[in-house]
Structures are given as structure tokens and as C-alpha cells.
């Protein structure tokens, strides 16, 4: 590959002609081979340039953002991860929450009612009480909704029956299309809960392992890991009610706006991006708690499904009590067990 040609191409894409930018591009290109080795990346000759261009732009974005973080202008750091080479259009395919898929369906949910005079702790983290399975990885399939749904049901099942069982996302990807879900092309957690209720269960992860692609349904009622009796929606946009719900009920499925390069490249800290919407939701994740950072304020603890190498060992802390940042409280629900 002619890296001088690539240098010119990237500069043209960024459309800024400056000595500083040229140095940043050169520095990023020098890190490319190390990145490929560190993350075990292999590309065909025809596709490597595309991924390298994306990597270079992301490296520059990381460097500029982290400079602002060091100056106290940002509350979180960004860094390289296994998806730092993805062009933004490919990255967006990971975000498979499809709110429109549910608009034409009749809702069959219950509404969350907070216990009377309830007092909840200042901090909650359900990872400490064995209600949360290890971080999983959806791969390049837009099945985030399935991971969010299984995560909530895993927690409810463990809370009620005392046993944490990893459940099958592939079962939901393959078998819940009649409920409005579209496998690797997206879906909704509530529709997954409806499928599980009517199907009288979802298989265990061990019996129906994840493949990361749409396949023929082969649910087996003999290997069911958990069931639900329906689901509960929390009040839309109400962070205080969501705080009470996660404190009293356990892990909760939520949808967020993850359609930003800052989210793709998040490394650590309390995530706050002024561009993050409370309505344009595109990614299903699992809320497992909340807390307060002494420097950057209140946050939610959110489990992602992009592997333990992303973010804070697979998790992200999202700003809390900042006008429903990224829509954490807009579409939240949990299954009834």
C-alpha cells in the first residue's frame, strides 16, 4: 500500500490543510501496524485502505478529545479499541435498537409504581450481588436488543430463584421475528420479553450458543433457562423513577443514543456528549446501577455488549441527572418473573 497516497486521501477527507493536521496523520499512520497486531486484525488488500482511513480519523479524534480532557473540558477519556478501525457507517450497524419497529404494536406492558415511601441507597451496583453475567460480545450483528433483554431477564431470574444463568441471545435473534424483531437488523427488548412470555421461555446460552448472524430457529423447550410473565415499563424520561426501579428491582433494559464517535471510542470516565439525544435512541444496553463521581457528578452504570475490551471492562458510566442524557430513562423496562 502506498501510504503517501493514503496520507493525501485522508487529508482530503478531513478537508483541513495545516501542518498540525499533517503531523497528526503521520503519527496515526505510524501506529497502524501496532494496532493491527494488538487487536489481531487482518484485511484484504482491497479493504485495508478503508479501515486505515477510519483508524487515522479516529486517532486524530481521540488525540484532540483527550487534550480537552486533560484541560478539564471533558469528563471522560477516549482510546483505541477493537472497533476503532470501523468507518462510522459500519459502526452504526452495531446499534440495532429500532424504536419504529414497535410503533404499530399494541403495548402489553405494566407500568412501574414505586413502593410507597421507599428510600433507596446513594449507590447501587448489581454486579456486586451476582445478578449480572460476564460482558458478552455481539460482534458485527445488530443484536444489542437481544443482549439487553437477556441481561435483564438473567438478573430477574437470579434475584428471584438465586441462580444466575446465562441466556441465549441467538434464540431471540432467530426466533422472535413474528414479534416485530429483525435479528441482526435490529429489534426491541419489550418485543423480546413478549416472545419469551408466549414461548414459555428462552434457552440457555450453553444450549443455544451465539453465532452473530441470522439463523433458522431451533428453540428447545428442554433447555429453557428462564421465563417471564410479561414486562414493566418505567415512566418515560423520569430519571428519579428509573433510579428507584433499578435500586428496588434489579438490572433494567434501556435504550440510548450511541450514535456518536465519542461513544464508539469511549475508554473511561463519566460520559457526557452535548450532541447525545434523549429521543434519537439506537442502542439497547443494560442498566446495572448508579453512583456519584467526586469530580464529575452523578452517573449510571451501563453494561454494553461489545466485549470486555471496550470502555471500562465492557461498561460505561453515563451522566445522570443531566436532562436524561442520551435517553437513559426514555425507554426502560424489565421482565416479570
Swiss-Prot record:
The keyword Signal applies. It is found in: Secreted; Cytoplasmic granule; Lysosome; Endosome. InterPro entries: Papain-like_cys_pep_sf (IPR038765), Pept_asp_AS (IPR025661), Pept_cys_AS (IPR000169), Pept_his_AS (IPR025660), Peptidase_C1A (IPR013128), Peptidase_C1A_C (IPR000668), Peptidase_C1A_papain-like (IPR039417), Prot_inhib_I29 (IPR013201). It catalyses: Specificity close to that of papain. As compared to cathepsin B, cathepsin L exhibits higher activity toward protein substrates, but has little activity on Z-Arg-Arg-NHMec, and no peptidyl-dipeptidase activity. Residues 19-119 form a propeptide. GO terms for cellular component: cytoplasm; endolysosome; extracellular space; lysosome; phagolysosome; vesicle lumen; yolk granule. The active site is at 144, 283, 304. Expressed in intestine, pharynx posterior bulb, hypodermis and cuticle (at protein level). Expressed in germ cells, developing oocytes, sheath cells surrounding germ cells and oocytes, and in the eggshell (at protein level). Cysteine protease which plays an essential role in the degradation of proteins in lysosomes. During early embryogenesis, maternally required for the proteolytic processing of yolk proteins in platelets, a lysosome-like structure where a slow and controlled degradation of yolk proteins occurs. In the gonad, required for the clearance of apoptotic germ cells in the engulfing cell phagolysosomes. In embryos, required for the degradation of endocytic and autophagic cargos. In embryos, may play a role in the degradation of lipid-containing droplets. Required for larval development. PANTHER family: CYSTEINE PROTEASE FAMILY C1-RELATED. Belongs to the peptidase C1 family. This is Cathepsin L-like. It comes from Caenorhabditis elegans.
Amino acid at each position: 500500500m502506498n501510504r503517501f497516497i493514503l496520507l493525501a486521501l485522508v487529508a482530503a477527507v478531513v478537508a483541513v490543510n495545516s501542518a498540525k493536521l499533517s503531523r497528526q496523520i503521520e503519527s496515526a499512520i505510524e501506529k497502524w501496524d501496532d494496532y493491527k497486531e494488538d487487536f489481531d486484525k487482518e484485511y484484504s488488500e482491497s479493504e485495508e485502505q478503508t479501515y486505515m482511513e477510519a483508524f487515522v480519523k479516529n486517532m486524530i479524534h481521540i488525540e484532540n478529545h483527550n487534550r480537552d480532557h486533560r484541560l478539564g473540558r471533558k469528563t471522560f477519556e477516549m482510546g483505541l479499541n477493537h472497533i476503532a478501525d470501523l468507518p462510522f457507517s459500519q459502526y452504526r450497524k452495531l446499534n440495532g435498537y429500532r424504536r419504529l419497529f414497535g410503533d404499530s404494536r399494541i403495548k402489553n406492558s405494566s407500568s412501574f409504581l414505586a413502593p410507597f415511601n421507599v428510600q433507596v441507597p446513594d449507590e447501587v451496583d448489581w454486579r456486586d450481588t451476582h445478578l449480572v453475567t460476564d460482558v458478552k460480545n455481539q460482534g458485527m450483528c445488530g443484536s444489542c436488543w437481544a443482549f439487553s433483554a437477556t441481561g435483564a431477564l438473567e438478573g430477574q431470574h437470579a434475584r428471584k430463584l438465586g441462580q444466575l444463568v446465562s441466556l441465549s441471545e441467538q434464540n431471540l435473534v432467530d426466533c422472535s421475528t413474528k414479534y416485530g424483531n429483525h435479528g441482526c437488523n435490529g429489534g426491541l427488548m419489550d418485543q423480546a420479553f413478549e416472545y419469551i412470555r408466549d414461548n414459555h421461555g428462552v434457552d440457555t446460552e450453553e444450549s443455544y450458543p451465539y453465532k452473530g448472524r441470522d439463523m433458522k430457529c431451533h428453540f428447545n423447550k428442554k433447555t429453557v433457562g428462564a421465563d417471564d410473565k410479561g414486562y414493566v415499563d418505567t415512566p418515560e424520561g423520569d430519571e428519579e423513577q428509573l433510579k428507584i426501579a433499578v435500586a428496588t428491582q434489579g438490572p433494567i433494559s434501556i435504550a440510548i443514543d450511541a450514535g456518536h464517535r465519542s461513544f464508539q471510542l469511549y475508554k473511561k470516565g463519566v460520559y457526557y456528549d452535548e450532541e447525545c439525544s434523549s429521543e434519537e435512541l439506537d442502542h439497547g444496553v443494560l442498566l446495572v446501577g448508579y453512583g456519584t463521581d467526586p469530580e464529575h457528578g452523578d452517573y449510571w452504570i451501563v453494561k454494553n455488549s461489545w466485549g470486555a475490551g471496550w470502555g471500562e471492562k465492557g461498561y460505561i458510566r453515563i451522566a445522570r441527572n443531566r436532562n436524561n442524557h442520551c435517553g437513559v430513562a426514555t425507554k426502560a423496562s424489565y421482565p416479570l418473573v
